[in-house]
């Protein structure tokens, strides 16, 4: 549940086994349904989203279990067509950072594991976001890479790796994070 403009809220809702979200106008009580779930919204109304079905399949702590797409037979470990999506004010959805590209950035191509991206979070101005690339290693430990994506120039930078957990933007260019290994 998040604010979407000053008089509207937006929340995720499973609709007949499919991802969706509802924009609810508090004043008029009108609803608009989007055919995707949301994660983060910037001040311009752009939305970040991800594949909640994949998230549930790989990490039962998050995601939604009652989605039809969970049993998709086309599952890939490092897909080019899945990752973080951006949805603009006209509700056009496009992939902005693929799992494949994140794996390449982090130099993890030779690791034979299923990867996922999660927690995409805009900075205050909405021109950057961070996300976590994650996988479970052979001993079952959750390995994470915190990546910052600059929407103005498309640059992706690894900020921290290995054990990364909670984070929060404190300014448009600074983030506080719990981790074991910061990138130099």
Positions of PLM-derived features:
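Hydrophobic beta-strand positions in blades of beta-propellers and related beta-sheet-rich domains
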Residues: 21-23, 82-86, 144-148, 184
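Loop-centered beta-sheet repeat module
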Residues: 109-151, 155-160
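Long, well-ordered mid-to-C-terminal structural blocks that present hydrophobic/aromatic surfaces
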Residues: 148-184
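Blade-terminus and WD-like Trp-Asp/Gly-His loop motifs, strongest in beta-propeller folds
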Residues: 1-9, 39-46, 50-51, 119-129, ...
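Short loop/turn segments that connect beta-strands within beta-propeller blades
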Residues: 25-29, 88-92, 150-154
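Asp-box/WD-like beta-propeller blade repeats and closely related beta-sheet repeat scaffolds
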Residues: 2, 8-83, 95-112
